[in-house]
Amino acid sequence: MPVKVMIPSPLRPYAGKRDSAEFNARTVGEALGRLTSEFAELRKHLYTEEGKLRSFINVYVNDEDIRYLAKENTPTKDGDTISIIPSIAGGLPSIARGGI
């Protein structure tokens, strides 16, 4: 069952500069495992040392957030798209930029 894993721009340097990869996988966890096996540098950006998906990494299957499904055990089927969306934080408060 090939599923497509979309790799976001900030993580592409750790995935051979690819924007996506396809794998045969029955679950989200299996697909992410195959992704990090192929691109070992990517693993530390997606997972903690304990092997848990990092809290700022959001994963979707066909626009459905896996946190509200079966998490990494969420089943996948042929043609599904898995999107990895890292949360972005930072910037300055408006007062620091001269605003109010």
State where each predicted segment sits:
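Ubiquitin-like/PB1-type beta-grasp interaction modules and other compact soluble beta-rich domains
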Residues: 1-100
